[in-house]
Amino acid sequence: MNQYQPLSSVWYGNDAELLEQVLNFYPRSPPETIIDTTFNKGRFWKGSERKIISVDIDPQYNPDFVCNNSDMPFLDSYADVLIYDPPHLTDCDTQNSSKIWKDRFGLTSNFKGDNICSTFDPFMKEASRVLKPEGMLFCKITDGVHNHRFQWNHIDLIESGKKFGFTACDCIIKARKVSMTSSKWQKAHHARRYHCYWIIFRKSNRCE
């Protein structure tokens, strides 16, 4: 039996290292089927030896499946673990948005408005279908400010998960060295964001 290794609620390393620890820590048995539903360039898996099924809406990244993650071509109760990393900025497909967001998220944003929460319910519904009972959903999410209003994205994500049979079981804060702030905002009346969250969901009404 492997010796217990505690996992800190604050993470200072990169996402790939954190995901490896998370995958060893939370699932009740070693996961066999892992789907990254927002694969992009695969940065979460650099150096990993795990077999990952990659999904992305943008074909330029050569994912295993080119599709919208709200309508994935998998059987019901197919996967042990899903990974979800939605866009962190509002209107990230607009003409004046930074190129890095288009490069990172491809065509994932086709909506307009003050927040990204309209994407949560369609994804959560599909994630609930694709995951096995007791399966795990690991979501990276960042709160933000748009139109001078704070966007509580991680809370909206948790509330969305509840609608479709998920329980939010844990939260890891990932600390950053630089803030996630648009370069056009030199002054702001909100605290700069130097962190994001990894929310740990289980497709169950319990966590333990």
Regions found by a protein language model. Name each.
Residues 1-208:
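Class I S-adenosyl-L-methionine-dependent methyltransferase catalytic core
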